[in-house]
A protein has these predicted regions:
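Short glycine/proline- and charge-enriched loop/turn segments
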Residues: 100-110, 174
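Histidine-centered beta-alpha loop that forms part of the nucleotide-sugar donor binding/catalytic region
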Residues: 97
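C-terminal/domain-terminus segments
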Residues: 136-160
Length: 174
């Protein structure tokens, strides 16, 4: 019914955990949630938020991941691998939250489109980045600060910008 709690979690400040009845939130050991400005020099502007929006939603986080004032919302499924670091105030959302048309919003304001997000192992997401629905972030990729990611990112690449574009591939040993 609740959130699967694992060993070694470190929580700074008060994160917001919003779990819809029937949904699933699980995080591996070694999770770090930084919701307190004094815990990180980049000072999060709000607490970490981990949220599921409906009964079928799944949010899974692997081992040894860290979040600073980040927001992760699963309307369908957000899967985050191991050793993923999410920078200050970044947002990961697999939903539009509401329909895009006025008619759709009038019919059901909360019926926004969803597509799963997959974040593979060893990914780094820079501060203020936005990861949108349907995206896969490949293993060991880096998302630059302030980037808006609406398309898949290949493994071992650096992307930046709005929309995010490949800047370069990571060299061996980087």
């Amino acid at each position: 019914q609740g959130i699967a709690w694992k060993s070694g979690w470190r929580i700074f400040g008060r994160p917001i955990l919003q779990k819809h009845r029937g949904s699933h939130i699980e995080a591996g050991p070694g999770l770090v949630l930084r919701s307190w400005p004094r815990s990180n020099p980049l000072s999060p502007t709000h607490p970490v938020v981990l949220s599921t929006r409906n009964a079928d939603a799944e949010l899974t986080i692997g081992a040894d991941c860290g979040f600073t004032g980040a927001v992760v919302v699963a309307g369908e499924r957000v899967s985050i691998g191991n050793r993923v670091q999410v920078g200050g105030n970044a947002q990961i959302v697999d939903t539009d939250f509401h329909p895009l048309t006025p008619e759709g919003r009038a019919a059901d304001f909360n019926a926004g489109a969803t597509r799963p997000i997959t974040i593979e192992d060893d990914v780094f997401i820079g501060m203020n980045a936005l990861i949108l629905k349907g995206v896969t972030l490949g293993e060991s990729c880096v998302v630059g600060a302030g980037s808006v990611v609406s398309r898949d990112v290949p493994p071992r690449t650096i992307v930046a910008g709005n929309p995010a574009q490949v800047v370069r591939e990571l060299r061996e040993g980087e």
